[in-house]
């Protein structure tokens, strides 16, 4: 038999003491003491009834009368009332007696400054709330309302739909202005657990804590500018920063001269003259360059192929670079329009910005036709001498590439030289007109060409006597000998002409006096030796040293070197191109090597395990042991070859290469 003992002070009442109290009335099976009540199990029903009758109202402690009765199972439905702001002087028995005046109280528990009272009937609970809410008990106004748990559910009762937090319509009677509380969001209805059918209400809006941009699973799509993967472009920036120049120079087919230069640097230009098909050389000279005055300065400076090739291959040829490209890629000192004296389509006659300007009629150059220098310097050895009409007419008897030139007589075209623009050679600080006749050889002149006379110009280049005829400057070659191809010219024919031509071919087009004055014969000899036919180069080596030395430096050092060595020694490697002779790629070109290099170079992103003294660091007392530092960009970004992020991000490919994101991705979650 189970006996309920109420109003027990659980703090100072032990089960043994309570069992000794019930022992005289029968056998006590067990005794359990709770906070303010206890349960005693007795074997015999008669002994239990005797104990209830004798001990009910007994004071185990002074002032605390026990409530002893048969234990009853709790009713299936009770109404739980919350009583707040309970005074510390109010006991559970006093609170129970206060509520029992309004109805049967099943249970009353006081916890600190609040209490819960369970009443059997709903009407009694509502009456108690209405009467006792705001009532002063032991000096404090109590707050009485239905508990948030509402009605205790029996096993057969359905779950209430709608608001779970408060009883529907139950307002605060102490403050009548407030109606029944309703939750702002009904989770059961929103997530499909509503027991009722469709009630006509629209679905409530999603609560704000899982907004689209805050959800870890569903982010806003990245902006379109970042969607394109960066692998589309880094190859252009990493390996060949100058797209048209580098790619064409490295990878163009044999249509461009760059391949010829790269594969056979010794006799590159001679080989290109011998081996190039007629499409690449003859057709531009024959068709495009037939009318030199019709070409614009930009087309002229684009090189031997003019408009016949796309800009990539045109830029990759020798004379065909623009101003910046040719200064990077040509023989080392050549400007855009003079980049190679062999390949320019409109060297001195057809270019508006780089021809030789207004010179006197007696000048050796004005006897050339405007289109005579369109051919290579090697192919028209007679172009620089003041040749007679008969000798220059021999050009008309050459291949069809010169037949298309507008003038039959070369010395009849002195007018185009007088009509050139101010950017031509006439605008240079020291024109050729002002050269005195005193200097007989170019090497013996301490000053630049500004000090030379007009009349002996032809002789001054090859260190020949002024009195000799123009044919003498070409090695006394007969005019018919000029019709031979570039590779077939005799050594004697090439001797004088290269002495004159190479100097012009190696000069930039901007100012001629200063380059002639300051440029040593090293770049001239090297650029000449690196590109000529071996036969022509041998004839050039046979020249006296002072015939070519503009600055008075002997060229024997360059002549004793092999042509490849001269080319390697004197050609400044272009900063943006890679040739066969280029050094191996830096780690900057490879994103994975770059990542390792970056992580070693910048200490903030360096991993501790990569340090040589990592063991000593971790064993020292002053080191803060922490996991290896993780860069903020580790696995989210692709290598961005030219961004500043690469400097500070360390090895950002270490962890998850498959999850690399674009460079604008948010770096910290």
Swiss-Prot record:
Any one of the GO BP annotations: gastrulation
Tissue: Expressed in all tissues tested, including brain, heart, skeletal muscle, colon, thymus, spleen, kidney, liver, small intestine, placenta, lung and peripheral blood lymphocytes.
Biased composition annotated in UniProt, kind: Low complexity: 287-303
InterPro entries assigned: Nucleotide-bd_a/b_plait_sf, RBD_domain_sf, RBM14_RRM1, RBM14_RRM2, RRM_dom, SRSF
Molecular-function GO term, any one: mRNA binding
Phosphoserine: modified positions: 161, 220, 242, 244, 256, 272, 280, 520, 523, 527, 562, 582, 618, 620, 623, 627, 643, 649
Sites of Phosphothreonine modification: 206, 572
Region ranges (TRBP-interacting domain): 307-354
Subcellular location: Nucleus; Nucleus, Nucleolus; Cytoplasm
Renumbered residue ranges of the record's region Disordered: 147-175, 193-232, 284-303, 566-590
Cross-link (Glycyl lysine isopeptide (Lys-Gly) (interchain with G-Cter in SUMO2)), chain numbering: 126, 135, 138, 149, 153, 164, 600
Alphabetized UniProt keyword annotations: Acetylation, Cytoplasm, Immunity, Innate immunity, Isopeptide bond, Nucleus, Phosphoprotein, Repeat, Repressor, RNA-binding, Transcription, Transcription regulation, Ubl conjugation
GO cellular component, one term: nucleoplasm
Domain of life (superkingdom): Eukaryota
Manganese recorded as keyword: no
Pfam family, one: RRM_1
List of residues that carry N6-acetyllysine: 164
Domain RRM: 1-73, 79-149
SUBUNIT field: Isoform 1: Interacts with NCOA6, CITED1 and XRCC5/KU86. Isoform 1: Interacts with SS18 isoform 1. Isoform 1: Interacts with SS18 isoform 2. Interacts with STIL and interferes with its interaction with CPAP. Interacts with gamma-tubulin. Part of the HDP-RNP complex composed of at least HEXIM1, PRKDC, XRCC5, XRCC6, paraspeckle proteins (SFPQ, NONO, PSPC1, RBM14, and MATR3) and NEAT1 RNA. Interacts with RBPMS; the interaction allows cooperative assembly of RNA-bound stable cell-specific alternative splicing regulatory complexes.
Record-given protein name: RNA-binding protein 14
Organism: Homo sapiens (Human)
């Amino acid at each position: 038999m189970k006996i309920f003992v109420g109003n027990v002070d659980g703090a100072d009442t032990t089960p043994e003491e309570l069992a000794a109290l019930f022992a005289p009335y029968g056998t006590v099976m067990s005794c359990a003491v709770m906070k303010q009540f206890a349960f005693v199990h007795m074997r015999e029903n008669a002994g239990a009834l005797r104990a209830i009758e004798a001990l009910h109202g007994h004071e185990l402690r002074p002032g605390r009368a026990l409530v002893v009765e048969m234990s009853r199972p709790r009713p299936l439905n009770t109404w739980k009332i919350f009583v707040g702001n309970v005074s510390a002087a109010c006991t559970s028995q006093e609170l129970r007696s206060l509520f029992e005046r309004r109805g049967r109280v099943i249970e009353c528990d006081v916890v600190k400054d609040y209490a819960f009272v369970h009443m059997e009937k709903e009407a009694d609970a509502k009456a108690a709330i209405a009467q006792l809410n705001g009532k002063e008990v032991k000096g404090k106004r109590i707050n009485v309302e239905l508990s948030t748990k509402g009605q205790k559910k029996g096993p057969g009762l359905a779950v209430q739909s709608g608001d779970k937090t408060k009883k529907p319509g139950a307002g605060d009677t102490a403050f009548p202005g407030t109606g029944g509380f309703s939750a702002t969001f009904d989770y059961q209805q929103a997530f499909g657990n509503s027991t009722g059918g469709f009630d006509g209400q629209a679905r409530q809006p999603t609560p704000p804590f899982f907004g689209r941009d805050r959800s870890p699973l569903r982010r806003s799509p990245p902006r379109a500018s970042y969607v394109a993967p960066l692998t589309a472009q880094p190859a252009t920036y990493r390996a060949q920063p100058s797209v048209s120049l580098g790619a064409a120079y490295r990878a163009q087919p044999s249509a461009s001269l760059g391949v010829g230069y790269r594969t056979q640097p010794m006799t590159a230009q001679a080989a290109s003259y011998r081996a190039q098909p007629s499409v690449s050389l003859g057709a531009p000279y024959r068709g495009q360059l037939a009318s030199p005055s019709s070409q614009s300065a930009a087309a002229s400076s684009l090189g031997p192929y003019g408009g016949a090739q796309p800009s990539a291959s045109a830029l990759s040829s020798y004379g065909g670079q623009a101003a910046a490209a040719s200064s990077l890629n040509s023989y080392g000192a050549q400007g855009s329009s003079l980049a190679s004296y062999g390949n320019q389509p409109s060297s001195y006659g057809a270019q508006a910005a780089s021809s030789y300007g207004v010179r006197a009629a007696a000048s050796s150059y004005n006897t050339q036709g405007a289109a005579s220098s369109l051919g290579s310097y090697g192919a028209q050895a007679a172009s620089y001498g003041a040749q007679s009409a008969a000798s220059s007419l021999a050009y008309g008897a050459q291949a069809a590439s010169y037949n298309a030139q507008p003038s039959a007589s070369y010395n009849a075209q002195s007018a185009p030289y007088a009509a050139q623009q101010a950017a031509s050679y006439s605008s240079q600080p020291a024109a050729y007109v002002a050269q005195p006749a005193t200097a007989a050889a170019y090497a013996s002149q301490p000053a630049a060409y500004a000090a030379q006379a007009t009349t002996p110009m032809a002789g001054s280049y090859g260190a020949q006597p002024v009195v000799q005829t123009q044919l003498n400057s070409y090695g006394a070659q007969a005019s018919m000998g000029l019709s031979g191809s570039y590779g077939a010219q005799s050594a004697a024919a090439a001797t004088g002409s290269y002495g004159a031509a190479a100097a012009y071919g190696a000069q930039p087009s901007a100012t001629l006096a200063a380059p002639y004055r300051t440029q040593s014969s090293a770049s001239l000899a090297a650029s000449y030796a690196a590109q000529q036919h071996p036969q022509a180069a041998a004839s050039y080596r046979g020249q006296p040293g002072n015939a070519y030395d503009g600055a008075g430096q002997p060229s024997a050092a360059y002549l004793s070197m092999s042509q490849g060595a001269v080319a390697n020694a004197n050609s400044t490697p272009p900063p943006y191109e890679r040739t066969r002779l280029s050094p191996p790629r830096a780690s900057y070109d490879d994103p994975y090597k770059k990542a390792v290099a970056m992580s070693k170079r910048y200490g903030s992103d360096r991993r501790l395990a990569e340090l040589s003294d990592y063991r000593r660091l971790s064993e020292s007392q002053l080191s803060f042991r922490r996991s290896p530092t993780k860069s903020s960009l580790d696995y989210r970004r692709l290598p961005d070859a030219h961004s500043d992020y690469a400097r500070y991000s360390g090895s950002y490919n270490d962890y998850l290469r498959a999850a690399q994101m674009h460079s604008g991705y948010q770096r910290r979650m």
